[in-house]
């Protein structure tokens, strides 16, 4: 039998409402799955300046809420999916650089979806490391 990976992408506001229910259903069926969180796609919005973006605090919240939901249900988050670049782009708002809607046009280089920049990616890596230590 092969492996099954379930990639969740609820959006930061919906994780705690829906993920625990999904976990319970999967467990009741006796399925052994790998859980992966995609906090990018469920948190894409159109900025007031017209750019497709992702608020960093929403991405962060979805990751944190996913860890919380898995802990409460006795399961483990086995993976995360991020869209990122090592370049200093301004495609996602927020983070320690405090990128706002007006900053998006400065270095918006994506050919498709907005990516976390190097600073935001590192900030997120530290969050994941903190969650894994719990």
Residue ranges and their predicted role:
Residues 1-134:
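Expand to "…catalyze enediolate/carbanion chemistry for C-C bond making/breaking, isomerization
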């Amino acid at each position: 039998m092969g492996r099954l990976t379930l990639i969740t992408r609820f959006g930061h506001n919906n994780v705690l409402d829906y993920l625990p229910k999904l976990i319970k259903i999967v467990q009741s069926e006796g399925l052994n799955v790998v859980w992966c969180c995609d906090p990018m796609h469920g948190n894409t919005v159109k900025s007031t300046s017209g750019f497709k973006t992702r608020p960093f605090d929403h991405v962060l919240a979805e990751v944190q809420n996913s860890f919380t939901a898995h802990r409460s249900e006795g399961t483990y988050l086995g993976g995360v999916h991020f869209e990122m670049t090592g370049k200093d782009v301004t495609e996602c708002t927020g983070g320690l650089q405090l990128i706002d809607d007006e900053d998006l046009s400065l270095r918006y280089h994506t050919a498709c979806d907005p990516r976390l920049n190097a600073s935001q990616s590192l900030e997120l890596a530290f969050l994941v490391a903190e969650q894994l230590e719990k």
